């Protein structure tokens, strides 16, 4: 350890100036940065370490804290805070070449004016030490909310039927389009019958084309980078609980989405219904 006088001489500063600097109170800017960093660290922890600068900035703005995104990014770098990056998911789709797919009613246009107009669906896999689980989801294209999902150790039609039935029970839509690829589960007779009896309009893109089902791919990429890449499941029960907590406890109610003005899916839907009720004229008397 060097003496202070020696270090001051090497750095060409006076010892009196050094001691004065030590006694000086932190500047208002430094104090504000320290307080802001503390808030950002708490937000980062609540996001399970997944949020980067854009979503942390959105959280601060929602809390009434006006701050630039560049400043947030700078303070995050200084504090060693970083979000996670997504990677491409692997498709599990197998096409039945003898089945007749439904027509493509979407044609890569996923813009809809409200909830329950268009649902998109797909399947991915969940690795565990006890073997693979498969996750089928139904996602509302308007809000990116997962409205139905199911997990199983198989890829039979029952898996996607369970996810569809959950979505139907929760949302009770009228004439919703259900868009998927041409996987055997979606082209099956049982799935087609369930769609007809519930008033769902099936739509299918091509097999394994990310552009035909970009929204599901985006959700699966988020699931993988924010959960599956960061945890290793010993049992299938552990994996099921983790996926449940991710979808129902984090993604739907809380996770801010860049395509939804950095609102969560549930809050985005609430805003839509609130605007609808405000815009509706009062009943005539």
PLM region spans:
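Charged DNA-binding/catalytic regions of mobile-element recombinases
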Residues: 1-285
